[in-house]
């Protein structure tokens, strides 16, 4: 197994491009930006030099770099956000990283960082957060894309994801954290998983590794209404209230969204569109980034 090199978050984009056959014409214009909110600092990656056209929100236990290949393929101004408690964004004292609270925090951040974005894209937890954001701040969400998630998500559908996230808090080496990640992602290349760990984990002082993200703690809201994520019933109601174009992108092999979820989504919002990406699991942006980029280009 390879060991971890010195980490530079802006030095790995050529690997993304090479793996997916994206022409490489030199390092893209990407920088870290921040917004101060009432819940702490929100950090994001700003792609391009113009005002963002798209806002990208990652899933739970991920970070803004999950969108790197999509961003390279799109080559448009993008803001890829680290959700609260993830990536370089601040951790909450109450460890409550649920859609409603995330949306309140991101409303503050996006009014500063991406007030005129044409599309908000959210995957998994980021998708539920973007749905809550569209409900509370519709002026910030002109088009909404949910990537492999609906409010119909439950523990059974997300069991494989939960099993991975509920793993050890610390790993004795980079090789150990890589081995576990490979075990749970057998369809992904080792190079992509290694790159993802470098973006999403940190080495602690004694040589061990841990994930960078903060997880919700017991008592922070989980299970209060018997659901894997609090407030899902209200998010179904939000689907009805969404007044902007709504697109659901399903991973063709993912169990997280089923046909009943699609039927409920389109019942509550008859104008919603659904696209299935063949061969993609839950992480559509990781499994089929070029296909997802083409879908998003069609919205611009």
Name what the model sees in each region.
Residues 40-88:
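Conserved HGGG/HGGXW glycine-rich cap/lid loop of the alpha/beta-hydrolase fold
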Residues 38, 80-121, 294:
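Active-site loop/oxyanion-hole signature of alpha/beta-hydrolase fold enzymes
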Residues 172-229:
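Conserved alpha/beta-hydrolase catalytic His-Asp/Glu region
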Residues 147-175:
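A catalytic-pocket lid/entrance helix-loop region that shapes and gates access to the active site
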Residues 1-52, 75-76, 114-116, 297-300:
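Alpha/beta-hydrolase fold catalytic core
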Residues 204-268, 273-276:
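Conserved serine/cysteine hydrolase catalytic core
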Residues 277-289, 293:
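Catalytic histidine-centered segment of alpha/beta-hydrolase-like enzymes
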Residues 115-155:
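Conserved hydrolase catalytic core segment
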